[in-house]
Amino acid sequence: KDSTIAAALCVEALGADRVIGVMMPQGHQKDIADAIDICRFLSIPNLTINIGSTFQTLCYEIDMAGDADHMSSMEPMIKTNLPARLRMATLYAVAALYSNSRVVNTSNLSERYIGYSTKYGDGAGDFSPLSELTVREVLMIGDDLGLPYDLVHKTPSDGMSGKSDEEKIGFTYDELDKYILYVEDGL
């Protein structure tokens, strides 16, 4: 949902001819079809760059370079965060190919509030149109922009671990947003 709404806001601000959707699956990911659908809906060009083989090669090379006495093998959390960092490096390479374009960060206030992002991964970017918006507000904007309901309200996940964001963090975004409003605004 965040990428969908950030892309729509960029189209509103800049025009569809100045926005490019970049999909970076790690092998086969079922949510790539949704990303292509939103690119069509927004009439923006898109690229698909599969990072799966790069990810596998990097994991292998890191394991081979490891010193068994001082370095553990690639633990699950390291492997979970690595694709986000590969994606960000890829986005900046693509941006450089398009007359030094800018990379959009899709993190929202709710994620930032609890530190739910990968350093130098999905938390990076040149500007952050959603950074001061809770998930509830992001959803409202998506609805106001007339974006497809199923893409705006789909269950958020990283697309890699097989778990939803809420399963990973242990509470719902609705609960988190209520807490943020209570603490920040004293409601």
Residue ranges with predicted function:
Residues 184-187:
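Short, intrinsically disordered, charge-balanced linker/junction segments flanking boundaries
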Residues 37, 53-60, 140, 153, ...:
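Charged/polar, solvent-exposed surface patches and flexible loops
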Residues 1-113:
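ATP-dependent adenylation/nucleotidyltransferase module used to activate substrates
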Residues 76-79, 83-85, 99-175, 181:
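Catalytic subdomain that performs nucleotidyl-dependent activation
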